């Protein structure tokens, strides 16, 4: 095995170990236990990720990347903005029915708990989420909507709202609080954020309105 292959194997082992320990212990997860579960030392964590927060940031990226790859496949390249938003919302609803949906939701809650308890971890996790979120912004930017193309800024504003609404709805589905929220409900809710175009205005664009 080459040095690069060994490095990648160790990296993968630490990420897998971090997933299990963090999911179980939350902000009380200990670096030495993560390293031990991976069959490595804490020195390997610092060598590969720089710090505990670096490992957790990489864990978020590792967790989100497959989802964004699936989203990119689910949204038709030739769809207008409403069509893209509709496809994104329907994909999001389908993830609620996946076998690993409860575990994914648990990890989300756990990472949020860690971000609130650790001043160093919070910004690192937020940076990882923003980096992956930029891929979603790119999926919406440039699509036609009401005779114009969606700008990068508009796509950013829309993405922020979409993720907030759909994450909340998904939690409701998994907790049994939104039993009637099927794919159509998700799609209608998401499309409503675009209808009226107020959300799509650039900041300050409506300042002069009466």
Language-model regions, residue ranges each:
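Hydrophobic/aromatic-rich alpha-helical bundle segments in the mid-to-C-terminal region
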Residues: 3, 122-126, 130, 145-210
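Helix-turn-helix
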Residues: 9, 13, 17-62
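Hydrophobic/aromatic residues within well-ordered alpha-helical segments
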Residues: 10, 52, 59, 63-67, ...
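Solvent-exposed, amphipathic alpha-helical segments
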Residues: 17-24, 70-74, 107, 111, ...
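Short, flexible helix-adjacent loops and helix caps
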Residues: 23-27, 72, 76-79, 97, ...
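Residues in soluble alpha-helical coiled-coils and helical-bundle/repeat scaffolds
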Residues: 26, 50-54, 58, 76-79, ...
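Hydrophobic alpha-helical connector segments
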Residues: 58, 72-105, 151, 155-162, ...
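Amphipathic alpha-helical segments used for helix-helix packing
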Residues: 99-126
